[in-house]
Amino acid sequence: MGTDFVEFILLPSLMATLATEAPNVQILFVSPDRRNLEAMLANSELDLVIGYLPEPPKELIRRTLFHEPFVCVARRGHPVLQDESLSLEHFVELPHVQVLLRDAAMYGDAIDTAIAAIGLVRRVVLWQPNFLAVGNVVSRTDLISTVPSRVAAHFVQELPIVAYDPPLALPAPDFAMYWHSRSQEDAGHKWLRGKIAVLLKP
């Protein structure tokens, strides 16, 4: 289980690794309701959860994989953003597209909490369920977005998009891997966890 961001940075290298080292292993990537993660791991409906969980179930075993800073993105030639930096004024005034994951409690909350701490509110006009679709919207409109840095790097490489440092301090979420204690000593599970940890190392 993981977001499309995790799919984007993990699946190509993971599948290449499995093709040579474990060709009989099959992967099913799903995005279940976060409220059911503990039960799904306990019932073997899921083997692993990978992502950013602000309040993970205490019964799960956790391994931090990496910290991912946020980056702001806008289309090249944006009529307002002519400078090399993004001002706080423009950040809160320009319309945003925000990723809204299944239970609405992940990335957007972290960003909006940081903005609220300095007494401001940004203007979100579009919510989307995944990160990679954001690039097409940003590249064709005057909307801006705040996304994980590796997503932003992909946008800049593939689309007419410019990346900016955020004009305020934003938390860098901890992306981690979670699993149930029943899988802790399983040899195959340990092998897969080790491979994923190496592949996701920044």
Protein language model features and the residues they cover:
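Flexible hinge/capping segments at coil-to-helix
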Residues: 60-96, 180, 189
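Beta-alpha-beta core module
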Residues: 58-64, 68, 129-181
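A late-sequence structural motif
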Residues: 9-10, 161-202
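Central regulatory/effector-binding core of bacterial HTH transcription factors
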Residues: 1-58, 128
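Short secondary-structure boundary segments
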Residues: 53-54, 76, 148-151
